[in-house]
Curated annotation (Swiss-Prot):
This is Histone H2B. The modification N6-acetyllysine is found at residues 8-9, 24. One of its GO terms (cellular component) is site of double-strand break. It comes from Mycosarcoma maydis (Corn smut fungus). Belongs to the histone H2B family.
Length: 142
């Protein structure tokens, strides 16, 4: 069996989302450049490596809740890490639930059950109500 490829670990720095980049995707906000191998005699072309973060969305929510408040890079990195961790936990639990029921598709029901299992008490109730509201809004917009 071939060895598994190494997983990329996100770096601990996430930049502030500037007000002018509100229309950009989160991956476009933070990019690295790496050199691609080139043939002899030709210039090396820099390729962009995408780094996906939730920084833009965290910044937008912050501005909706507290328009005059800023956020440091370190705080943004912590929040980004938190969102990624919760997302991964919910996705893993939903995947397990789908496999227990011999289904190959994760539906909103599996996500809802995963949230109930992962988040405690009142927090899960609020998360489920907000999720249901978002799904309803999305469905009605089609």
């Amino acid at each position: 069996m071939p060895p598994k490829p190494a997983e990329k670990k996100p770096s601990s720095t996430a930049g502030k989302a500037p007000a002018s980049s509100a229309g950009k995707a989160p991956a476009e906000a933070a990019k690295k450049t790496s050199k691609a191998p080139a043939k002899s005699g030709e210039k090396k072309k820099a390729t962009k490596v995408r780094k996906e973060t939730y920084s833009t969305y965290i910044y937008r929510v912050l501005k909706q809740v507290h328009p005059d408040t800023g956020i440091s890079n370190k705080a943004m990195a912590i929040l980004n890490s938190f969102v990624q961790d919760i997302f991964e936990r919910i996705a893993t639990e939903a995947s397990k639930l789908a496999s227990y029921n011999k289904k190959s598709t994760i539906s909103s029901r599996e996500i809802q059950t995963a949230v109930r299992l992962i988040l405690p008490g009142e927090l899960s109730k609020h998360a489920i109500s907000e999720g249901t509201k978002s799904v309803t809004k999305f469905s009605s917009s089609k």
